[in-house]
Amino acid sequence: ASEIVLKIVGDNEFGLLSTISNVIKDLHINILNANFETKESRFVGKLVLQVGNTNLLEQLLRKLKSLKGVSEVQRIS
């Protein structure tokens, strides 16, 4: 398993953080660290995750990008 860092940007909508967390949980990916900041109607999140393989990472990125309210998902390391 490797440690990766994701940046997520989106609308500050009620329940969206919970939805993001559930997507990660459903893929059995471990959250090592999470930091979310809101500014007006937007949020920026930085997640440190432990991901088993590249296939899983690709699934995660695809699912997060498809969420309503999420405008950007980017691997930063």
Task: Provide a role label for each language-model segment.
Residues A1-S77:
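A conserved regulatory-domain signal marking ACT and ACT-like small-molecule sensing domains
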